[in-house]
Every structure is written in structure tokens, then in C-alpha cells.
């Protein structure tokens, strides 16, 4: 008997809709990363992308515990001398709430070409509207 290895072209990829309202950022992100990798499937193979597509709505309504709203910092560098920009989680949620979830999930995925492919299957929207109704996503309760 040989070991089963999933083939990328035969993997069944489903679309799921996740409502982030009232969910904790870290706990939500770990489950999203797990499903993007495909670890919830019995056909999971480490070197093959077996994950599903995830549509996350209501990103502006996520919850964090403790003082993370003021203490957690996001840094970005423009490339110019002295232009290291820093903003708190509270400011980031006001400016672009969907990017907070994207950054958290991206850090939990593998670094490399396959990780980037997995990351592209994550669609995050700040409101309750999304343009993926044609894919008929199933509601996923996390």
C-alpha cells in the first residue's frame, strides 16, 4: 500500500463565508490560516495547496483583548530615510480594517510561493457586502 498524495488539480476547493463580527482577532486568524492551508481536510498534503477559499465580512467589528488597541503597533517603511511609519491597532482599524486580518493571517501562512498562493484565496471586506455571491459561499461558523 502506498502513501496517498493529493494532486493540486484534483483537490476540491470550496468557498466559505465567515462573519468576523465579535470574533477575537487571533483566534479567528488561526482558524482562517488552518483552512487556507487545508489542514482541516483528510487529503492534506504539506507540499500541495489543498485549502479552500474564504470570504470574511465585517472585518471592522473584530475584537481584541487587553490593551492591544493602543499597545499593538504596525510598522511600514516607505523606502526614504527617516520614513518609518508606525500606527496603533486602533488607528489601523479605522483606516483599513480588512488589512488587520490580512496581516495576521499572512504571518501564519508558509513563507514562499505556496504561501502566497494560499494567501490569495483569502478575501476580506470591512462591511457586510461582498462581490462573491456568484460562488455561492457556504456560511462557516468559527
Swiss-Prot record:
GO terms for molecular function: mRNA binding; structural constituent of ribosome. Transmembrane segments: none annotated. PROSITE patterns: RIBOSOMAL_L13. The keyword Hydrolase does not apply. It holds the Pfam family Ribosomal_L13. Keywords: Ribonucleoprotein, Ribosomal protein. Part of the 50S ribosomal subunit. This is Large ribosomal subunit protein uL13. It comes from Xanthomonas oryzae pv. oryzae (strain KACC10331 / KXO85). The lineage of its organism: Bacteria, Pseudomonadati, Pseudomonadota, Gammaproteobacteria, Lysobacterales.
Amino acid at each position: 500500500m502506498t502513501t496517498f498524495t493529493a494532486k493540486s488539480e484534483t483537490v476540491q476547493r470550496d468557498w466559505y463565508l465567515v462573519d468576523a463580527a465579535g470574533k477575537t482577532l487571533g483566534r479567528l486568524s488561526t482558524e482562517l490560516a488552518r483552512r487556507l492551508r487545508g489542514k482541516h481536510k483528510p487529503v492534506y498534503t504539506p507540499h500541495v495547496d489543498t485549502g479552500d477559499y474564504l470570504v470574511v465580512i465585517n472585518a471592522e467589528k473584530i475584537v481584541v483583548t487587553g490593551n492591544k488597541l493602543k499597545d499593538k503597533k504596525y510598522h511600514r517603511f516607505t523606502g526614504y530615510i527617516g520614513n518609518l511609519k508606525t500606527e496603533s491597532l486602533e488607528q489601523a482599524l479605522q483606516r483599513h480594517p480588512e488589512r488587520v486580518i490580512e496581516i495576521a493571517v499572512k504571518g501564519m501562512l508558509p513563507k514562499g510561493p505556496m504561501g502566497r498562493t494560499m494567501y490569495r484565496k483569502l478575501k476580506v471586506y470591512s462591511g457586510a457586502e461582498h462581490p462573491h455571491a456568484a460562488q455561492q459561499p457556504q456560511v462557516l461558523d468559527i
